[in-house]
Design a protein with these regions (language model features):
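Charged, low-complexity intrinsically disordered regions
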Residues: 36, 45-55, 80-85, 89-226
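Generic alpha-helix initiation/capping and coil-helix boundary signal
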Residues: 2-3, 32, 212
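Transmembrane-cytosolic junction motif
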Residues: 18-42
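Short strand-coil-strand connectors
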Residues: 40, 61-65, 95
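Acidic, Ser/Thr-rich low-complexity segments on the non-lumenal side of membrane proteins
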Residues: 47-79
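Core hydrophobic alpha-helical transmembrane segments of single-pass membrane proteins
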Residues: 12-18
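Feature marks short, highly hydrophobic, charge-poor N-terminal signal-anchor/signal peptide-like helices
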Residues: 1-11
């Protein structure tokens, strides 16, 4: 009787294991199939696991720039016990622009004055985004405010080191996309910056095609304005 019980229990365990494996396999492949369909519909190129740190990669061409969308995966640290991190990164190598930087969203707080924002924003931008080598090359930084109306949820800050004629590439269409298209992103998981030779958008990864589309759409719209 006991032997029969163990056999049945073992079979149930095997069946459960197979069911979980099949469910995961179907779920993962269903996601990749939807990504492939999205790429095919937009003439993008899809590649799964281009290297050990990238789950999948999408490439496309807009105007004169080739862009790359990647789902990076950071392997866990077995010593510290840190969990696996997964994030999206949209990048455009070779963007030739030296006077434009964009920093992510800051929540509206009773329309704060420029003086209140300047020190905090510039300090965070230099420390977390540009790095010392790039920051050294900036002679002068000013903050130009956008979205000071109730039409948008967030305020975007554009930083430039050319006071006379800063290049403005954020308009209402872009700002609306940035404000309403990234509700799924936590504030500290979203960064967008144009460096002297590269545009980068980085945010947390999801399994929603609409989120992938939003990141690519934002990046390509910015490229079209450069």
């Amino acid at each position: 009787m006991a032997e029969r019980y163990f056999i049945i229990s073992g079979l149930l365990f095997v069946i459960l294991f197979i069911a979980i494996f099949v469910y995961h396999f179907i779920k993962v492949n269903s996601f990749y199939n939807r990504v492939k369909d999205f790429c095919f519909a937009n003439n993008f190129k899809f590649k799964k696991n281009p290297n050990k740190n990238v789950k999948f990669q999408i490439t496309g061409f807009t105007k004169k720039y080739h862009w790359i969308f990647q789902n990076f995966i950071v392997k866990p640290n077995y010593i510290s016990g840190d969990e696996i991190e997964s994030y999206f990164q949209f990048s455009v190598p070779g963007v030739k622009i030296n006077n434009m930087f964009i920093i992510g969203k800051a929540e509206m707080a009773n329309s704060p004055g420029i003086e209140e924002l300047d020190e905090k924003v510039v300090s965070m931008f230099l420390k977390n985004v540009l790095g010392e080598k790039v920051a050294e090359k900036l002679n002068d930084i000013i903050v130009i405010e956008f979205g000071r109306t109730d039409a948008f949820k967030f305020q975007y800050l554009t930083l430039s080191h050319k006071k006379a004629n800063p290049l403005l590439i954020i308009d209402e269409e872009l700002e609306n996309l940035m404000a309403n298209g990234f509700d799924w992103v936590a504030d500290n998981d979203f960064s967008l910056v144009i460096l002297p030779d590269r545009l980068i958008i980085k945010t947390n990864a999801t399994n929603e095609i609409s989120d992938i589309k939003t990141v690519i759409e934002l990046g390509t719209k910015i490229i079209m304005r450069i």
